[in-house]
Amino acid sequence: MKSVNLLIAEELGAREGQVAAAVDLLDGGYTVPFIARYRKEATGSLDDAQLRTLEERLGYLRELRDRRTGVIESIRAQGKLTPELAAAIAAADTKARLEDIYLPFRPKRRSKAQTAREAGLAPLAETLLARPETVPERAAQGFVDAAKGIETAEAALEGARAILIERFAEDADLIGRLREDFWRGGEAVAKVRKGQETTGQKFSDYFDWRERLERMPSHRVLAVFRGEKEEVLDLAFAAEGEDSAPGAPGPFELAVCRRFGVSARGRPADAWLLETVRTAWRTKIRTGIKADLRARLFERAEEAAVKVFAGNLKDLLLAAPAGGRATLGLDPGYRNGVKAAVVDRTGKVVAVETTYPHEPQRRWKEAVASLSRLCRQHGVELIAIGNGTASRETDRLATEILAANPDLKMAKVTVSEAGASVYSASAIATRELPDLDVSHRGAVSIARRLQDPLAELVKIDPKSIGVGQYQHDVTEQKLSRSLQAVVEDAVNAVGVDVNTASGPLLAQVSGLGASVADKIVSHRDANGPFRTRAGLKKVPGLGAKTFELAAGFLRIPDGEDPLDRSGVHPEAYPVVRRILEATKSDIRVLIGNEAALRLLSPAAFADERFGVPTVRDILAELEKPGRDPRPAFKTASFQEGVEKIGDLKPGMQLEGVVTNVAAFGAFVDIGVHQDGLVHISAMARKRIASPSEVVKTGDVVRVLVLSVDVPRKRIALSMRLDDLLEGATPPRGNAPRPDAQPRRPAPAAPPQDGALADALRRAGVSSSKRS
């Protein structure tokens, strides 16, 4: 049997030694970000994505190993463990295969087969299966025993049949093969329930629908499961030949027949055996297989949905920061007014206000004047506008503010406000902004997330940020674990200024956690900013191991040691000293000197502890200490006069922002309160496997309007801007129509009605836009 490390190595395409080293480090309490960045020699430079996969597979395979041990102990206790069975259990490479093998030995409720065996009917069953020339009724007469509850030959045959049915249904190899045959050839079939045609309209694409199981994309799987859960759809699995007439077995029944030597050759027991196979298939085997495939289909779709959510969250967290610029945050609304908050370049709140420029009060000029005064008073450079209800009207308000104050040279940006209301009412917001009304905290969050999306969004439960595909239909624990890993990797990829970071941001740093993060903030508040990384050791609860895990990701931009603002780990400072000695230079002269550093050979400074990969990273950090891997900040410009879906016309070319990436395409905010959909087939001239190959959440893109369905609130977009020149019809071949669907009846793009959450109902994305 292959070791866990070898299995993972084969899956990753890595050496077993690399995996073994990574496993040892993980077991030793080291974090994925730390291992990926500072233990490259040990792992052969496995990156964070590979390490996350390794970590996940390690957990699965260890669970499988433990379950395998439990199964062996259970079967041994029953006195039924044979060398062949032990070998089969050892070779089981999935939990499903292991459970198939264990099924005949699993403790179960009293069954008809067990009762029949206790009545002594096992020999009858074996005789009829082994010698079909036996006449069933005649053989059964010898097993009639009223004292055992077998009063007739028919009762004896019924008991023998129950024994064989259980045997057929618990054959691990047979069930595994039938399951795979059904998976490859089977279909999911959805029908609308009677009387649900109107109330279940959002699932109308699935009212009469079928699709091959193995080809179903995750969003359609979760859509039909949700329709079934909401009692709009009936969902069934079907395969050709699963139902057949008595005496004419279909392919699945024939597979059972072949496995146990049953055939129709005119012998006395043949018809009885064929009916036994038929009953076994229809009442037990098929039922179990369909339950297994339902679970498999959901798990596969769930895995894909979680992956989409994680990818979108990563893109959002690593979106370009506007940086330290005074920002006015506007949380739009009608009746309750537009909430405004000004934060200075450090994110500190310096002013809040509520204005009522829109219906029903329409105090437009007063709002322009008061907000202009705030901008001038606090030197505002950016205006961040939440993208919820009244966003476009508030955008016009901001435009007028800019026009009235040209000397301030301000810019306005529309910002996703998803999750801002959750933050406003959270314990974190109460702790950060105790004197601020809940209604103004959302405006603060909108302003800050423009300055630094990562620093602000870590304060919000990722599930509330609204970039997930069917996030409410997947397993909570699996989703949370994946998203937590994304947040941790993003924060550590960027690094954290230990003197300005909030507690929630520090909590995501490798090795820290909420408790130590709060202690760092308390120590900073009581003693002033940290001057060196070494000073972190004075924080209560921050021991040697925690310091080792965290120090490289914590930055001190204006500290005593220039290295403390870089990603060079303190443990590697001796390497830098050797470089300084060799170059006869001072750190303040060498750091940032790209020309001088690029003349150095990493191999010249490597030793037994710090190899070439680490030295190469050190030199790169010295070139650009504390470099931010996030892209440069830029904004989309919405077209004037295009403010609602009715303003759109096919052929328009517009600029927009990608708000969400799903398996079937990307949603783009083009400024009309309704995101449009760029289907995966309309993203590029070449065939692509995933929309994420082309776009990510937050990207500014230019799109072509293909079609607009105002009543259904559907907007079809294309990123192939020359489609219009071809009559909006892409060429045949590898680039199907933007609205192309699978050959079998399948749903069109999800209906887009209302706010983003409603727009993405069928795509499973939740993103509430607040009023």
List each model region and its residues:
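Long, charge-rich intrinsically disordered scaffolds of nucleic-acid metabolism proteins
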Residues: E84, R97, I101, V413, ...
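Long, charged amphipathic helices and adjacent flexible linkers at domain junctions
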Residues: D292-A301, A305-A310, S464-G495, A604-P650
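Duplex nucleic acid-engaging cores and interfaces of nucleic-acid transaction enzymes
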Residues: F34, Q50-T53, Y60-G329, G333-S424, ...
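C-terminal accessory/binding modules appended to enzymatic or scaffolding proteins
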Residues: G13, A320-A322, E488-S522, E640-V678, ...
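Accessory alpha-helical DNA-binding modules that contact the DNA backbone or grooves
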Residues: T31-V32, D47-A147, A493-A632, Q639, ...
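A glycine-rich phosphate-binding loop feature that marks nucleotide/adenosyl-phosphate handling sites
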Residues: E180-E187, L330-Y334, G388-A390, T414-V422, ...
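Single-stranded RNA-binding regions, centering on S1/OB-family and related RNA-binding modules
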Residues: L554-S771
